[in-house]
């Protein structure tokens, strides 16, 4: 059975004229063009440019329309041979999981699909900031709903920094509500979250880069500490924040030149962050020692060996932690706690942790 119709996903890049020649060809030859806006504010210059270049109507659609997808797929399947439908979006179309799911549905219906790739904020962030692309790790979106307490963002950033990797934070913008997360709001949210977890992931002195409206004529780049950036105004969205991990000297030189700041102010943030075990093991060791001290006077001499082994495990935990052997440190604390608990299970003494 032959395929029925075509669904072409066209990336528009980062702004006006960011679409490739191939993308323009697909837009011009389409029967229907849907232009998707839901994470980036409407940009009149882009709309004007596309209307001029393709000479046909653009149908602006939102997130719900694309997620539902039925109208798009129905349009592609109309007529004996189907129609050519283009879904255009800023950035690269396959960065959005919604598009990938729609593509799979189209293929199952016998609709031919094609993807025209383009630049994204994720790729442009490295080029714009002067950081090495391969050193970026998991990218995170900061949403309006969670900006007050950024637990998931905090933990992902923590893991990235432990690896010495850079982190890209994409700040959400809801085109329907006309609201988004500003860089100062995201920074304030991270600092509030640090107060809860206290792992040294971020502080007022954390060095970061703010990238606003990349790919546009009014693009803005800023660098500084959280304390400095939290006081700045960054204008219209979209915005993103880069928090560097370990910096190669060539990255430091590039950041200094691009952002126009003294090289001595450019710094990575990985050295300041505490490993999870560095936070937990000292607390567990101290607590276990307090409990041991409280029950020791109640124990008969025959349990001296148990007490001695508890102390040995606690010292092992501290030594393993100092040598970066976090898993063994956690296990050693667990063994120490288990020995003390065994005294309770045996009915020797009652212990209140």
Residues covered by each model-derived region:
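Short, charge-rich amphipathic alpha-helical segments embedded
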Residues: 304, 337-353
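Class I S-adenosyl-L-methionine
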Residues: 1-112
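Amphipathic, heptad-repeat alpha-helical segments
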Residues: 269-308
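Beta-strand/loop-alpha-helix module characteristic of Rossmann-like adenine-cofactor folds
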Residues: 2-10, 113, 120-268
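Short, charged, amphipathic alpha-helical segments
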Residues: 304-308, 327-334
